[in-house]
Regions:
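Gly/Pro-rich, tryptophan- and cysteine-flecked surface segments typical
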Residues: 2-11, 27, 49-50, 95, ...
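Terminal connector regions
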Residues: 51-113, 120, 184-205
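A structural detector for beta-sheet-dominated domains
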Residues: 10-12, 32, 99, 121, ...
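Intrinsically disordered, low-complexity Pro/Gly/Ser/Thr-rich segments with frequent PxxP/GP/PP motifs
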Residues: 19-54, 157-187
């Protein structure tokens, strides 16, 4: 951009309960600097320091929240007068996952991973009605999160998308739900954690 950006960087613990995203203050992962001033055309490196080990075999989820702090000075037009403008305060939310010993979810080109430690989401789904509106409910009983994209309900040759692109995340042990595009019947499928191929999600038993 053409203006100096003042940013606040915070890291929150992230969980899911009652079909909602939950955030908590925490000191397990610290972002530095907490406030940054970035001049036009420049970059800012943010360092993340973990102060506490993750329990073995577990995945912990965090959200890095980057907020733009509005300037106290109004924008100035080319003629030197105060410019009338609509100013938007931007917010960026970046997921962060930390793993305990014996668990991993992505390949590491720098070192060999133990195949026994690979963590996979274990998903199932069902339909529910909330105030007479159909919803798709997805449960994750696996050890790691599931990032769901391009999710659709398929019935024969027809496909009804729940979302174009990112639908959302389901953290380990959590249940999330999303509104369905009409009555639900058929198969639920989508891309899980960026997989190249669309995968079917089994119905709940």
């Amino acid at each position: 951009g053409t203006e100096t950006a003042n940013l606040q960087i915070r890291v929150f613990g992230w969980s899911q309960s009652g079909f909602e995203e939950q955030y908590r203050n925490q000191r397990e992962v610290i972002g530095s600097p907490p406030v940054a001033k970035i001049e036009p055309g420049q970059k800012q490196l943010v360092r993340l320091t973990r102060t506490k080990d993750v329990p073995p075999g577990q995945e912990l989820a965090y959200r890095i929240i980057i907020d733009e702090i509005p300037s106290a000075q109004p924008p100035v037009a080319e003629d030197g007068k105060t410019a009338a403008a609509i100013r938007f305060q931007m917010r960026y939310s970046v997921p962060l996952f930390a793993y305990g010993a014996g668990l991993w979810s992505k390949e590491d080109s720098a070192r060999q991973r133990d195949p026994k430690g690979i963590g996979l989401p274990q998903l199932s789904w069902r339909t529910v009605a909330v105030e007479r509106r159909p919803y798709v409910e997805v449960r994750n009983q696996g050890a790691v999160h599931a990032r769901l994209t391009d999710v659709a309900i398929k019935q024969g040759s027809q496909s009804k998308p729940l979302a174009e692109g990112l639908l959302g995340y389901v953290l380990p042990g959590a249940v999330m739900r999303w509104p369905a595009p009409g009555p639900v019947a058929g198969e639920l499928a989508g891309r899980i954690n960026g997989a190249a191929k669309v995968q079917s999600i089994p119905p709940a038993r």
